[in-house]
Amino acid sequence: MKNLKVIISGGGTGGHIFPAVAIANTIKKRVPNADILFVGANGRMEMEKVPQAGYKIKGLNIAGFQRGSIVKNIGLPLKMLSSILGAYNIVRGFKPDVAVGVGGYASGPLLRTASFIGVPTVIQEQNSFAGITNKLLARNASVICTAYDGMEKVFPKHKIVLTGNPIRSEIVNSTATRSEAMKYFGLDENKRTIIV
């Protein structure tokens, strides 16, 4: 039996990277011999954080659209073409069984290419307000995993699976007490703390 091969793509911020790592960790826990490859944007946070988590990563030469600055977007069409060619080479070389996108620049060309080649694609949307990349990819996605109800306003209802947000096991299994956490973050236990 062949090993399960999964490409996970996206990043740019911890809000994309850490759920992606949680997905990879869960896959490895359930299918220990799974071969997982991350694809991110060159020069972005994922190129450092993913290898620290123990996974391989390849980078695409991609950047997002800079709102309000035409000058900063002059090279964007070339970067898009370069990233699509790079994604094509990665997908053809790795031959994944499935491609997972978590949002961010790199997931766009990677999932678009995987879908075009015939690889099933999964989008994971962590937010109640869907990101631009995931909105653009939704039409061709096989499955769209969401963290919140009501996402059929943005995504095709028949593709949505309510999964909640992927959380890394070291957070779920933490034995830290409330008191230890308050002390660690320098917060006063007698005051109400709201995280925004």
Which ranges hold each PLM region?
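Conserved nucleotide-sugar phosphate-binding/catalytic loop shared by glycosyltransferases and other
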Residues: 3-11, 29-78, 165-167, 184
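Short amphipathic alpha-helix
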Residues: 16-27
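Glycine-rich phosphate-binding loop signature in dinucleotide/nucleotide-binding domains
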Residues: 31, 90-95, 185-189
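An amphipathic, basic-hydrophobic alpha-helix
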Residues: 65-98
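Active-site-proximal region of nucleotide-activated glycan assembly enzymes
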Residues: 115-178, 187
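Conserved donor-binding/catalytic core segment of Leloir-type glycosyltransferases
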Residues: 188-196
